[in-house]
Every structure is written in C-alpha cells, then in structure tokens.
Amino acid sequence: MTIMAPRTLLLLLSGALSVTETWAGSHSMRYFSTTVSRPGRGEPRYIEVGYVDDTQFVRFDSDAASPRMEPRAPWVEQEGPEYWVLQTRNSKASAQTFRVNLQTLLGYYNQSEAGFHTIQWMYGCDLGPDGRLLRGYHQYAYDGKDYIALNEDLRSWTAADAAAQITQRKWAEANAAEGMRAYLEGTCVEWLRRHLENGKEMLQRAEPPKTHVTHHPVSDHEATLRCWALGFYPAEITLTWQRDGEDQAQDMELVETRPTGNGTFQKWAAVVVLSGEEHKYTCHVQHEGLPEPFTLRWEPPSQPTIPIMGIVAILAILGAVVTGAVVAAVMWRKKSSDKKGGSYSQAARSDSAQGSDVSLTACKV
C-alpha cells in the first residue's frame, strides 16, 4: 500500500496566532475522504470534506466538472488563491494515491476487480480550551471495516488484520508516524486556531435547544413520551429520561444527533410508559447554550373552559338565528317579487344560477 504523505499546508499567516489564546470548550478539525471503485465505469470517485467542529468548511469531488477544493463556509472564502491552489493540489494527489491503494488492497485480500470497494480516511486534531493539542487522528477503513490507525501516542500504529499488518510494517520502516505527528502537532493546530478566529461568529456561538415533549399512545395501556431538542448548536447535547428521579437510560430510545440543514441540530429521546403514569417522568436536557440543565415533562392538553353542553346550546342558538335570517330573507324576497309582478319560483331559479350568492348573503347576516 502506498504511504500517504501528510497534508502539509503552508501557513499563510501574517503572524502566528498566540498559543495562549483561549476558547470556550474544546474544538476539532477533521478531514473525511471516501474513495469508491466503479468497475467498468471509469476511475474511482474521490470525495473529501473538511469540518471544523460540526460545520463543513471545504469540499472536493473528483466527479465535478472542474475538480477543485471549494469553500463551504463564509469565513474560509477570505483565504487567498494560494490556499485553494494548494488544497486542490493535495486533494488531487490523494485521489490518485487512493486509486493505487485500491488496487493494492485487492491483492492483499485476494479480491476480484469486478466488485465495488471503498477506502475511507479520517485525520485531524482536537484542541483544548488553552489552544493546545488534545488528540490527533489518522485512520483508515476498507470496505466499511477498520484497517489501520495511528495510536494516541502519535508514534505507532494499530493494524486491524493480517493485511493491515503489511501496511503497518511498511509505514514503520518509512517512519511515517513521525511525519504525521509533525502535521498534527503543527500545521493542523495552527489552521484550526486560524479557522476558530476567522469563523468565531459561527463556530464559537452557542444556540440553546428549543424543547418540548410529545405524547403518542401505543395501546390502551401504554404511551410513548418523546423529548425533543431542536435548533441547537454545537451538536453536543445530553437528553435523559427519569422516573421519580431515577435514570431510565436502559429503557430509553435515543437517536443520533441530526443536522437540520440550517447549521443547527436536532435530537430526541423516547420512553414507553404506562398510561396514567406520565406525570412520573421528566426529561433532562444539558447543552452548552443553557445556563443550567433544563427539566421538562409532558403537559396534558388543558380542558375546554366551556362545558360541552354549553357548546351544544350555543350551536343550537346560532342555528336558530341563521334559520330565522334565511326565512326572513325569503319572505322579504317574496314580497319584493310580488310587488314587481314576478313569482317566488322565478326568483329562486335566478339565485341558483348565480352560484354562491346565497352563501355570501347568509354570511353577511
């Protein structure tokens, strides 16, 4: 397997950001790429996306009419042409390398070229509140399974199987971990700091979730309570259900946090309860945008303030009023037509021909 050279981006900085600068919480920059073979349909497709925290900021697609790294966030659009030329060059080089890697892995696993295969690659760095490296990443997967990964010490590799051990030996001989460590501790950290500074209005904001609980009957004896958190940023959030103060994690259905398409996220957690015991359950929400954890429960819809019999009586009265108005209108029209020498039946035929005039007249009454 060909050794992937680390992405060495030139620091296009007039002055390096201070190491002592701080940010609220930890932050990350990750690049994700996928290479998919297409037997009989041309070269494999290569797609690469970059994220700062939960926000995509760059994207490359080898199938584009003019393949190049493109901005996906407003703050990165201000980078100069040198940045985009270098990013595009690196992505094209990675695409070519992974095409070779696909062929190599077919040999390692004794597979036919007739099938579809994928290589996934993820690398990046996490930054602490003090602006220093927390963790570096560099890992591969083949056909959806772990292949090889750089360990937390950034000096050694973990191979998932015998085929990956071949790559591990090659990379150990070439001292590939040293180059990757230099990138993660240097270039990756510096660019993440730069993105956090340039995109701070978007990346360092905290939008609290909008929360509510919905009630869904399952049977005559059970119902599902679903706790919703909508429109929050960043994506990290905790939803838990409690019954009389005790966590219900084992009985709770929890979906993955999902993007809403407008730069925020949504999530829900559900629990099945016995009908009549809904009041015993509370949903607890923790998020960076909330000053303190928030607790809510399902509130049954309020009862109507007017009794049912009262509503029936009111409707009966309204019906009588409308009926009286219609009768009065008919009698008035009959008298009017008699004065003109016409008949009531002629007037009725004339009204029906005008379509909605009767309804319009009735509404006015």
From Swiss-Prot:
Annotated segments matching region Connecting peptide: 299-308
Extracellular side: 25-308
Disulfide bonds: C125-C188, C227-C283
Glycan-carrying positions: N110
GO cellular component term, pick one: MHC class I protein complex
GO BP terms, alphabetized: antigen processing and presentation of endogenous peptide antigen via MHC class I via ER pathway, TAP-independent; antigen processing and presentation of endogenous peptide antigen via MHC class Ib; immune response; positive regulation of T cell mediated cytotoxicity
Biased segments, Polar residues type: 346-359
Positions of region (Alpha-2): 115-206
One Pfam family named in its UniProt record: MHC_I_C
First-listed, main subcellular location of the protein, grouped into a coarse class: membrane
Matching Gene3D superfamilies: Immunoglobulins, MHC class I-like antigen recognition-like
SUPFAM superfamilies: Immunoglobulin, MHC antigen-recognition domain
Ranges per topology, Cytoplasmic: 333-365
Family, per entry: Belongs to the MHC class I family.
Function: Involved in the presentation of foreign antigens to the immune system.
Assembly description: Heterodimer of an alpha chain and a beta chain (beta-2-microglobulin).
Stated name of the protein: Saoe class I histocompatibility antigen, C alpha chain
High-level lineage: Eukaryota, Metazoa, Chordata, Craniata, Vertebrata
